[in-house]
Amino acid sequence: MSVLDQNAVDINPRISEAEVGDYIALLKPRVMSLVIFTALVGMAMAPGHFHPVLAITSLLCIAVGAGASGALNMALEGDIDAKMSRTANRPIPRGRITRPEAMTFGMTLAFFSVMTLGILVNWIAGALLAFTIFFYVVIYTMWLKRWTAQNIVIGGAAGALPPVVAWAAVTGTVDVEPLLLFAIIFFWTPPHFWALALFRSDDYARAGIPMLPNVAGPDATRLQILLYTIVLIAVAAAPWALGYFDAVYGVVSLILGAGMLVLAINVYMRRERSQSLRATRKLFAFSILYLFALFATLLAEVVFRALAPMAGGA
């Protein structure tokens, strides 16, 4: 049965008794926080002056677009979420919100976020935001996630696009710098989510999602995590190696990368189940810290550059 057929079967004409908190949960606030932060870094890196009102508008539109993607994802995956312990308490499996309501909510937010960004800022950014939402909802959620173990690899492009959208909001173009940010997030995604998939493999198997551990096995997944981590370290150092950022960022990226590598090697070496679960959980948790710290360093250097001339003039 296809995703659309499943949705048709599950449509319930009743009106739910949802509270505001249930609709907020549809937006996936934790994912939104990462989207906003990476978009902020992309915006701060962009050259030229950007009016604060337009900057706030752009970030809000990107955030709302991400929230719309989350709501549409939950609407389409209500059947999956109900089978997984990690997602069973989401509003749709609990019966707080119906799938048609979530779909309407998500589509409304998607429309207004794209149109607002396009009309008030520029249509390059608006088009990129529309493509990001489309890629996450249609390409990843409706197709890749249910049909291929490479779902995270290809689908990770959607999560990597917010800095590119933010850069385009400022400049109306796309350049090398935001593509480097895109590449960092893109290559960070597989180690992050495959670590989750390793210690949640039973959950994914129960839901019928072909995550790599359930298709290729845990050992192959551990090797892929290690290989992608090595690539990630090199990609993360690229903004410094190519001369876009100073040595401070380069050192921080290598230190953080060393931490990721040690944990990835630990995951690769630990084959006994209890030790493997601990190792994968540590890598998953550290990977979140890794990305925030890496982008925080980028942002700090951009801010320092902006303040340095004023300090010198004083």
Curated annotation (Swiss-Prot):
Gene3D superfamilies given in the database record: UbiA prenyltransferase
Note: Carbon 2 of the heme B porphyrin ring is defined according to the Fischer nomenclature.
GO molecular function annotations of the record: protoheme IX farnesyltransferase activity
Pathway the protein takes part in: Porphyrin-containing compound metabolism; heme O biosynthesis; heme O from protoheme: step 1/1
Catalytic activity: heme b + (2E,6E)-farnesyl diphosphate + H2O = Fe(II)-heme o + diphosphate
Domain of life: Bacteria
Gene: ctaB
Biological source species: Bradyrhizobium diazoefficiens (strain JCM 10833 / BCRC 13528 / IAM 13628 / NBRC 14792 / USDA 110)
Function statement: Converts heme B (protoheme IX) to heme O by substitution of the vinyl group on carbon 2 of heme B porphyrin ring with a hydroxyethyl farnesyl side group.
Chief location: membrane
Short name of one Pfam family: UbiA
Keywords for this protein: Cell inner membrane, Cell membrane, Heme biosynthesis, Membrane, Transferase, Transmembrane, Transmembrane helix
EC numbers for this chain: 2.5.1.141
Name of the featured protein: Protoheme IX farnesyltransferase
Cell compartment(s), UniProt: Cell inner membrane
GO biological process, one term: heme biosynthetic process
GO cellular component, one term: plasma membrane
Membrane topology classification: Multi-pass membrane protein
Family, per entry: Belongs to the UbiA prenyltransferase family. Protoheme IX farnesyltransferase subfamily.
Transmembrane segments: 31-51, 52-72, 119-139, 152-172, 179-199, 225-245, 247-267, 284-304
Taxonomic lineage: Bacteria, Pseudomonadati, Pseudomonadota, Alphaproteobacteria, Hyphomicrobiales
